[in-house]
Amino acid sequence: MVLKLSANPLFKAGVSMHPSHPKICEQIQENEESLLKDIKCPQLFLSASNDGASVKLGGLGKQVLGDALEIVEFPDMLHGWSIRGDLSDPTVERDVRKAFNLALEFMNKYM
């Protein structure tokens, strides 16, 4: 999990496409706010339309991480689009390309 690894000072940045940590925290009974507070490096969340409120603008992630978190929302996408989206759909292909380009730019900025 990107956020767990991001608590290690050896990591310089983290990118989460359609972040699923809110659901995972719920399933393993871990406090999401505590998980976020442990993060030691900048983060980029690329959120789909049906991802939870905590990974969107104004959500818990932004409240806890502040300027250390960038969020880009993809209102036309559903959770999982970047790894299992139908690339024959031009809208999905467009947003997958955009997401991966944003991720590369973000990582290059901090590496």
Question: Where does each model-flagged region fall?
Answer:
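Conserved alpha/beta-hydrolase "acid-adjacent" motif
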Residues: 52-58
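N-terminal Rossmann-fold cofactor-binding loop
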Residues: 18, 47-49
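C-terminal catalytic histidine-bearing segment of alpha/beta-hydrolase fold enzymes
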Residues: 66-111
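Ligand-binding pocket scaffold of soluble enzyme catalytic domains
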Residues: 4, 13, 44-47, 56
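Short beta-strand/loop motif that positions the catalytic acidic residue
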Residues: 38-40, 44-47, 74
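Conserved loop-alpha-helix segment in the C-terminal half of the alpha/beta-hydrolase fold
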Residues: 58-68
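A short helix->loop->beta-strand "cap" motif at the edges of active sites that frequently abuts
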Residues: 11, 40-43, 66-68
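Primarily recognizes the serine-hydrolase "nucleophile elbow" in alpha/beta-hydrolase
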Residues: 1-32, 38
